[in-house]
Amino acid sequence: MNQPLHYQSATEIASQIIRRKRSAWDVLEHFLARVEKYNPALNALIWMDTAGARQTADDADAALDKGQVWGPLHGVPMTIKESYEVAGSPTTWGSPEFRNNVTDTDAVSVQRLKKAGVNLFGKANVPLMLADWQTYNEIYGTTNNPWDLSRTPGGSSGGSAAALAAGLTGLDAG
């Protein structure tokens, strides 16, 4: 049985991109359309770099035109928990004290994911200091469960869980 693109594994998505069954651009646009449609009710993703992700998708497709594969996750659209340092993005851990903290470096894990070929396009909501059973903080508000908006998707990685469950991303590190 063929699953919709947004519920396929990251390795399945990468394989389709690498084998030129889908372009990195089209895959990214699929996920961005889902974010636009579903994220307003979920508040799972709280920061996005759409322009940067589109450029990376173009670069991923151009690399394949030259026979270059970036890694096993070539072109896969990915989001990541807000607490990870991603250059140019807020990293607050949901704490108002760090509201204006924008990091200028990538965490080692982010560097390694990018080396594997991912297209990191957004960050997912977290509870205050990553330490609650639900996902709420004063900066970004509440993340809702995609299957029942009156419920929580859980705590520390709730934004990541909601984004994956709703098919807003091909991969997430929470």
Question: Model-predicted segments: where are they?
Answer:
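Enzymes and membrane/adaptor proteins characterized by extended Gly/Ser/Thr/Asp/Glu-rich
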Residues: 72-109
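Glycine-rich, aromatic-flanked loop segments that form ligand/cofactor-binding clefts
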Residues: 61-84, 118, 123-125
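An N-terminal boundary/leader segment
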Residues: 1-55
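Generic hydrophobic alpha-helical segments
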Residues: 13-17, 60, 160
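Flexible, acidic active-site loops/lids enriched in D/E/S/T/G that coordinate Mg2+ and/or position polar
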Residues: 50-73, 99-103, 113, 133-153
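Short glycine/serine-rich loop segments
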Residues: 105-174
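Conserved hydrophobic residue
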Residues: 22-23, 69, 169
